[in-house]
């Protein structure tokens, strides 16, 4: 056992200055070596419609969140983010008017939800630009935000069908049909605008991030659904996910 004198000498030799922090990108605020900004569109996209992201506060702490990719990929004012657990609050300036707009639609599965593809794209039959509301959080968080915000119950709800497999390959999704916030917003916006190029351009930073991570030791992730079917998922699953998987057809 070390003597008290030795212990104090070792403590005294520890550098009192904090470790050097890595330089961060002034835009995405990620360390420069892992910045995904080079994947953003060369010119910010300016669709007629705009995205309205209602974000759970816990999302801010996630290091690989994708909502900022929408913020910096779209022209200023085309992607508005409001943070909270219920909406609208006094600090959410302008949100009440947006939610009351007849051209506002929300991606959320309800009994009355219609498929997004069934809506007229902007310009068809005089359709004006949409306000597309997306709840940003885990499914339990999104569900809580919806139920805690009565005004959302009066917003026309829509759903995406025939979803592609997520291209966010360095993150494990709950099921094969789950998409990141970026992928959801990009796909939905391209449908409402009738322009598939919007999706392709907005996904640029996600592709850049995944490519960099895979080149530096990350591995491709399969969904929890896929791994459970293959009996390779090590964790216990909740009752809700187990119920979902029981009704899904086997491949």
Over which residues does each language-model region extend?
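Short Cys/His-rich local motifs and their 1-3 flanking residues in nucleic-acid-associated proteins
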Residues: 30-33, 37
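Short Cys/His-rich Zn2+-coordinating modules
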Residues: 2-19
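C-terminal folded domains that constitute the principal catalytic or ligand-binding module
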Residues: 131, 139-251
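Histidine-anchored nucleotide/phosphate-binding helix
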Residues: 38, 62-73
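Short cysteine-rich clusters marking metal-coordination/redox-active sites
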Residues: 25-28
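S-adenosyl-L-methionine/SAH cofactor-binding core of RNA-modifying enzymes
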Residues: 75-147, 151
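Short metal-coordination and nucleic-acid-contact micro-motifs, chiefly zinc-binding Cys/His arrays
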Residues: 21, 31, 47
């Amino acid at each position: 056992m070390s003597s008290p004198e030795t212990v104090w000498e070792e403590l005294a030799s520890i550098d009192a200055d904090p470790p050097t922090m890595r330089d961060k990108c002034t835009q995405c605020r990620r360390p420069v070596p892992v910045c995904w900004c080079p994947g953003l569109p060369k010119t910010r996209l300016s669709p007629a419609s705009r995205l309205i992201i209602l974000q759970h506060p816990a999302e801010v702490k996630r290091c690989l969140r994708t909502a900022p990719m929408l913020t910096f990929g779209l022209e200023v004012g085309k992607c508005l983010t409001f943070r909270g657990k219920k909406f609208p609050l006094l600090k959410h300036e302008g949100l009440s008017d947006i939610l009351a707009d007849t051209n506002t639609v929300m991606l959320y599965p309800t009994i009355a939800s219609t498929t997004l593809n069934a809506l007229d794209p902007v310009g068809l039959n005089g359709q004006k630009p949409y306000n597309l509301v997306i709840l940003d959080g885990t499914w339990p968080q999104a569900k809580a935000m919806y139920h805690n915000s009565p005004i959302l119950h009066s917003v026309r709800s829509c759903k995406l069908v025939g979803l592609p497999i997520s291209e966010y390959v360095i993150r494990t999704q709950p099921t094969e049909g789950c998409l990141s916030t970026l992928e959801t917003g990009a796909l939905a916006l391209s449908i409402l605008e009738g322009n598939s190029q919007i999706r392709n351009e907005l996904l640029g930073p996600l592709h850049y991030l995944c490519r960099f991570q895979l080149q530096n030791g990350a591995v491709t992730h399969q969904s929890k659904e896929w791994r459970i079917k293959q009996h390779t998922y090590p964790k216990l699953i909740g009752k809700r996910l187990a119920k979902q998987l029981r009704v899904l057809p086997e491949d």
